[in-house]
Structures are given as C-alpha cells and as structure tokens.
C-alpha cells in the first residue's frame, strides 16, 4: 500500500484481499501449520459470504478441497453460479 492510497483512504478490492488470505493459508500450511480440515470449512463460509454480496448462492453451491500429490498441493474451489 502506498502512502498516497493510505492518505486518500482507498480500499483494497475483495479479490486482492482474498488472494492475500489464500497466500497466507498456503504459506502457513507449507511451514507445518494446522491440517487443512481446520481452515477449509471456514474458507468455504467466507467465500459464500463474499460471493453472496453479488450473486444469490447457498453453501451447497461452493466446494473447496485441498489435494496433495508428492510435493504439489492444489487448492480447488468449485463455484456453481445460477444463470440469470
């Protein structure tokens, strides 16, 4: 965040905030943090809350999973958005 944006009070966009949160979760997981079962349900609820601001969805419309294969981790988020 630059000094100018701090002084003018510009807010971060929700996409950049979500990206930062995901980066923190992944970094925490890589250094031996808590198991993925702890934060995945909370992440799913937050995603529902954010997306619900723009589109009507339910908890069942979002699925979050973390798969590990050797040294590769894949965070998969599937979102079903109803057609207008």
Swiss-Prot record:
Task: Provide the alphabetized UniProt keywords.
Answer: Cell cycle, Cell division
Q: Which InterPro entries match?
A: MinE, MinE_sf
Q: Name one GO biological process term.
A: cell division
Task: Give the family, as the similarity comment puts it.
Answer: Belongs to the MinE family.
Question: Function, please?
Answer: Prevents the cell division inhibition by proteins MinC and MinD at internal division sites while permitting inhibition at polar sites. This ensures cell division at the proper site by restricting the formation of a division septum at the midpoint of the long axis of the cell.
Q: Does the keyword Iron apply?
A: no
The record, for Pfam families, names: MinE
Q: What is this protein called?
A: Cell division topological specificity factor
């Amino acid at each position: 965040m630059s000094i100018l944006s701090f002084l003018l009070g510009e807010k971060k966009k929700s996409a950049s905030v979500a990206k930062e949160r995901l980066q923190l979760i992944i970094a925490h997981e890589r250094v031996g943090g808590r198991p993925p079962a702890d934060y995945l349900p909370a992440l799913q609820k937050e995603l529902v809350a954010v997306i619900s601001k723009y589109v009507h969805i339910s908890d069942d419309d979002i699925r979050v999973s973390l798969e590990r294969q050797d040294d590769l981790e894949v965070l998969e988020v599937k979102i079903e958005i109803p057609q207008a």
